[in-house]
Amino acid sequence: MKILASSTNYVLHNRLSNSQYEDARSKIVNFGGEFTNDAAKADYIFVNYSQINRVRRELRTIGTPLETCVSCKLIVKIDWLNEPKESLTPGNPYVIWHRKPEMKVGSPYTPSTRPASHTEAPNDFENHETPNTENNNEVKSIDNVDQEGSVYPTTKEYPYVLEIPRYACQRKTPLKCVNQAFVNALSVLKTCREVNGESVRTRAYGMAIATIKAFPLPIDSAEQLEKMPGCGPKIVHLWKEFASTGTLKEAEEFQKDPASKILLLFYNIFGVGASHAAEWYQKGWRTIEQVRKHKDSFTKQIKVGLEFYEDFCKTVTIEEATEIYETIVSRMPDGIKIQSCLVGGFRRGKPVGADVDMVLSPSHTHSTKHLVDVLLRILDEEFQFRLISVQEHSCGGKKGYVMLAVILSNSSKINRRVDIIVVPPAYIGSAVLGWSGGIFFLRDLKLYANSHLGLSYDSFEIINLKTGKDICPDEFNEWKDPVEAEKDIFRYFSLEYIEPKFRNTG
């Protein structure tokens, strides 16, 4: 059945698992259609939504507003692919939007004045992963709006602001931004959601923060903010409150709340998550000492977190981190050649951090396991240290390792957490990139690689989803400087190289 013959089709990845996404792509091809990774070129766009206003928003967030999809004839619920009995016409019940004959197809998305009567879609911020089914009567008028104006400002200095990129891996995100005061207030609310175990809301706040930090101009209107990826009505409402009062009431209440202070105290223990913090609070525990009385029942990581709690609360300076890193790499035996790099927040320009992360890779003449053994000897000779764990990872048939140790710093005499990542030569670029962060930069890099390139990326492998093969041994097998190896990954992904200091998404 070639019911999609001669059509070009796009699948909106949002709210689809990787397997569902790949299944949809396969069905499109089986039905005679062509698949494209560019929504702007598609005749049909398949989505896992039932409301067009949600689709409009998601298309905007990936940097392809519906107005730019000049080829699109229909937007179709993805369920149609399971039983395509009826042809795709505007009257099909699976079609949630069609291009009206009288609609003028314009040129690519350009700034214009937003209609004064336009009302934003219902707030989906508090329930980010499920469709909003409330206020259906209210959104019907929005469903019939064929064109929306853009309010993105654009300047010669910041041309990308015209359509701020959907993916954080395409944006420059500094450590401090021009809207930092608002970001700080939102970060308190993100922490509030995080310590209460609200992962969806935590992620939603994080997405908004990552976008706002990348915006290079002061936000001076709600209309300006609401067009940014991840900044829905909730964030706009908070901005209005902050713009008028200079603070956020909920953030202030969280910081003053006695229960929240205790939950945050527990949550900040190394190895402890939101569920443990809540459980301990429900048991009536209120101090670290009360928790320590029950340490025998905890995991190894939590025991370490409790034992070194006071030291782990003291931040590491970049000078101390560099000293620890240089001590380790300088003690390498002459016969072992390595490429290495200090990663984590310090590579992004943070002056202080919670731990010390580094990536090391031996030349082709030595195995990663041999390097791990050498590193253990160096740690034993140069520091008082305790090995917490050594995790093994597959790297295209070879082995990669993550060593977690607690060492007593020679300069500060404070116990520090140290992560040492050891990878084969072909994987130093992916490891340096993956361990340099920030969280939402990497999250969006993975989404971009998956949806646009058909690749599954992490620090230890890059898998071609069609073949199931790790591409690193073939594409990146040259042993080279970590920065150059990292740049190779960006080039392979067809992305502009973003310097680490501009990956501070949080």
Swiss-Prot record:
Region: Involved in ssDNA binding, residue numbers: 348-357
Cystine pairs: none
Subcellular location: Cytoplasm; Nucleus
EC number(s) stated in the UniProt entry for this protein: 2.7.7.7
GO cellular component: cytosol; nucleus
Region (Disordered): 106-150
Gene3D superfamilies on file: 5' to 3' exonuclease, C-terminal subdomain, Beta Polymerase, domain 2, DNA polymerase beta, N-terminal domain-like, DNA polymerase, thumb domain
Catalytic activity as recorded in UniProt: DNA(n) + a 2'-deoxyribonucleoside 5'-triphosphate = DNA(n+1) + diphosphate
UniProt GO MF annotations: 5'-deoxyribose-5-phosphate lyase activity; DNA-directed DNA polymerase activity; DNA-directed RNA polymerase activity; metal ion binding; single-strand break-containing DNA binding
Record's keyword terms, sorted: Cytoplasm, DNA damage, DNA repair, DNA-directed DNA polymerase, Magnesium, Metal-binding, Nucleotidyltransferase, Nucleus, Transferase
Residue span, BRCT domain: 1-98
Physiological role: Repair polymerase. Involved in gap-filling in DNA non-homologous end joining (NHEJ) required for double-strand break repair. Can incorporate a ribonucleotide (rNTP) into a primer DNA.
Family: Belongs to the DNA polymerase type-X family.
The protein's name: DNA polymerase type-X family protein pol4
Organism of origin: Schizosaccharomyces pombe (strain 972 / ATCC 24843)
